[in-house]
């Protein structure tokens, strides 16, 4: 039988702390309260205005100030904190160090950790949907002379909560296969 945590801090460190707390399950993807500082530099290497999103201890995305293209910002984060990055205008997903989730590690010799934010290689369909969304108002999508399924695709705007659900599912599948990257809890 698993041992109960003596304190909330200990519960944060215990495996399986996704268990029921206050009557609801804890989200799988959430920041861990490690209290181990990590200096990070967010580098926007994309042509888009970037919206950094920190997943708090309850798994809720918390927006941080935007980063214009070609700029960087020093962030005081912590080991075990989870970050996502989105286009500030369209909410299209962006990559950080070639992946979707960024988890700061400990600094080595006082050097900051770099989080390089870039555009992913979108599929042709995804990119076309982005362009049409930028040119056509949502109320006019169904006036376009296109196949019906594309109306639904256009109306299915990028959504960070859906992405978190998808990433959670991928995390659970990777965990079951024993392939989970270090630092993701």
Curated annotation (Swiss-Prot):
Its main location: cytoplasm. Residues 1-24 have a biased composition (Basic and acidic residues). Pathway: Protein modification; protein ubiquitination. Residues 1-29 are annotated as: Disordered. GO terms for cellular component: cilium; Cul2-RING ubiquitin ligase complex; cytoplasm; endoplasmic reticulum; glutamatergic synapse; intracellular membraneless organelle; nucleolus; nucleoplasm. It is a peripheral membrane protein. It is found in: Cytoplasm; Cell membrane; Endoplasmic reticulum; Nucleus. GO terms for biological process: amyloid fibril formation; angiogenesis; blood vessel endothelial cell migration; camera-type eye morphogenesis; ciliary body morphogenesis; endothelial cell differentiation; extracellular matrix organization; eye pigmentation. It comes from the Eukaryota. Keywords: Cell membrane, Cytoplasm, Endoplasmic reticulum, Membrane, Nucleus, Tumor suppressor, Ubl conjugation pathway. Gene3D superfamilies: von Hippel-Lindau disease tumour suppressor, alpha domain, von Hippel-Lindau disease tumour suppressor, beta domain. Residues 123-132 are annotated as: Interaction with Elongin BC complex. The Elongin BC complex binding domain is also known as BC-box with the consensus [APST]-L-x(3)-C-x(3)-[AILV]. Belongs to the VHL family. Involved in the ubiquitination and subsequent proteasomal degradation via the von Hippel-Lindau ubiquitination complex. Seems to act as a target recruitment subunit in the E3 ubiquitin ligase complex and recruits hydroxylated hypoxia-inducible factor (HIF) under normoxic conditions. Involved in transcriptional repression through interaction with HIF1A, HIF1AN and histone deacetylases. Ubiquitinates, in an oxygen-responsive manner, ADRB2. Acts as a negative regulator of mTORC1 by promoting ubiquitination and degradation of RPTOR. Component of the VBC (VHL-Elongin BC-CUL2) complex; this complex acts as a ubiquitin-ligase E3 and directs proteasome-dependent degradation of targeted proteins. Interacts with CUL2; this interaction is dependent on the integrity of the trimeric VBC complex. Interacts (via the beta domain) with HIF1A (via the NTAD domain); this interaction mediates degradation of HIF1A in normoxia and, in hypoxia, prevents ubiquitination and degradation of HIF1A by mediating hypoxia-induced translocation to the nucleus, a process which requires a hypoxia-dependent regulatory signal. This is von Hippel-Lindau disease tumor suppressor. It comes from Rattus norvegicus. The gene is Vhl.
């Amino acid at each position: 039988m698993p041992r109960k945590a003596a304190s909330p801090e200990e519960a944060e460190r215990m495996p399986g702390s996704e268990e029921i707390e206050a009557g609801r399950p804890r989200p799988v993807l959430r920041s861990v309260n490690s209290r181990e500082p990590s200096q990070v530099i967010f580098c926007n290497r994309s042509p888009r205005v970037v919206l950094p999103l920190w997943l708090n201890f309850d798994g809720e995305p918390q927006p941080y100030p935007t980063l214009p293209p070609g700029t960087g910002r020093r962030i005081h984060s912590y080991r075990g904190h989870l970050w996502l990055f989105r286009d500030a205008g369209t909410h299209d997903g962006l990559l950080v160090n070639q992946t979707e989730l960024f988890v700061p590690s400990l600094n080595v010799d006082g050097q900051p950790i770099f989080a390089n934010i870039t555009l992913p290689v979108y599929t042709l369909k995804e990119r076309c949907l982005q362009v049409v969304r930028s040119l056509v108002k949502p109320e006019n999508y169904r006036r376009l002379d296109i196949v019906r399924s594309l109306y639904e695709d256009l109306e299915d705007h990028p959504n960070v909560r859906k992405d978190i659900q998808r990433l959670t599912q991928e995390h659970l599948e990777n965990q079951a296969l024993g392939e989970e990257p270090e630092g993701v809890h």
